Design a protein with these regions (language model features):
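Bacterial Sec-dependent N-terminal signal peptides
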Residues: 1-25
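Phosphate-group recognition and catalysis centered on beta-loop-alpha active-site segments
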Residues: 18-295
Length: 295
């Protein structure tokens, strides 16, 4: 009876313990999954990142015409690595015809990703895959980890938006945020879904309406200081994620003194990865998660 009561108490406490579980000591982030070796922002890229040692999956999302959340980097299909449903090329002049916010997901799904050679990443494995829904990607990753007895991963979601493309490439920040929160709550990810953006507006909406969501500010702007950016943002995010070339010991010390973590992007060179980790970075975003085992 005593052991049964103990078990019941442990089970009762589990949700609270899980909800407040600490973040990883070092974020090993697979950029767009494993962009260096697999078609980016696809389910195979996410699975490969986990196999290669990533504890966090980074990806980009957009909202479709019918209100779905799709995983893809640009606001429209990139002809460099995507082809039409029949396998024919997408001409650069046609990109305006394939803006996700102006397409239903059923019309997006048949486009083919990964079949053609991608000159930026010649090591990418060629295959035929597609742009998944965020919900489908999460389900696939969670099922893979459960099947292979792997630890749960974190999801680092980037909101792709800009004030100048509101209404054309994405909804207003308030609507965008609500679509993401629907998926987050449905999938019960809790603290494992982290959200970052270069656009301050959706971060401000999230901070105001969903203060428990862990947020990160992305930057690659060397002409605007950290202090100016934080003043514009209006609050201290949990993460300040700059381009790796902007990271200094002074920046790291300041961020840490304010309780912010720094996870720079996008680092390919192993020596740069070692240098940033030794300097005190809280993680690294890379196209090559397999290189984490050399740190």
């Amino acid at each position: 009876m005593k052991s049964l009561l103990t078990l019941m108490m442990v089970v009762a406490l589990l949700p609270a313990v899980m909800a407040t579980a600490p973040l990883p000591a070092f974020f090993k982030v697979g950029h767009r999954g494993t962009r260096g070796l697999m078609p980016e922002n696809t389910i195979p890229a996410m699975i490969r990142a986990i196999e290669d040692g990533a504890n966090t999956l980074e990806f980009d999302v957009h909202i479709t015409k019918d209100g779905k959340v799709v995983v893809y980097h640009d606001a429209s299909f990139d002809p460099a690595y995507t082809t039409k449903p029949d396998g024919s090329e997408i001409q650069p002049s046609e990109r305006g015809n394939y803006i996700f916010y102006q397409m239903n997901y059923n019309d997006i799904r048949p486009f083919r990703i990964g079949e053609k050679p991608y000159s930026k990443f010649p090591q990418q494995q060629r295959m035929r895959t597609y742009a998944p829904l965020l919900s489908e990607m999460i389900d696939s990753v969670e099922a893979y980890n459960k099947m292979h007895h792997k630890a749960p991963v974190y999801y680092l979601l980037e909101i792709k938006s800009s004030e100048k493309t509101d209404g054309k490439e994405q909804p207003a920040p308030e609507e965008y945020v609500e679509k993401l929160m629907e998926v987050k709550q449905l999938k019960k990810l809790g603290h494992r879904l982290l959200i970052q953006s270069f656009d301050m507006r959706p971060l401000q909406v999230l901070h105001q309406k969903y203060p428990k969501v862990i947020l990160g500010f992305l930057t690659g702007d060397k002409n605007v200081s950290l202090y100016q950016q934080l003043e514009g943002l209006g609050f201290l995010p949990k993460f300040y994620n700059p381009h790796f070339s902007l990271v200094t010991k002074e920046l790291l010390d300041y961020c840490h003194s304010k309780g912010m973590k720094v996870v720079p992007w996008t680092v390919a060179d192993i020596e740069d990865m070692k240098r940033l980790k030794a300097m005190g970075a809280d993680g690294i975003i890379t196209d090559y998660p397999d290189r984490f085992n050399k740190l």
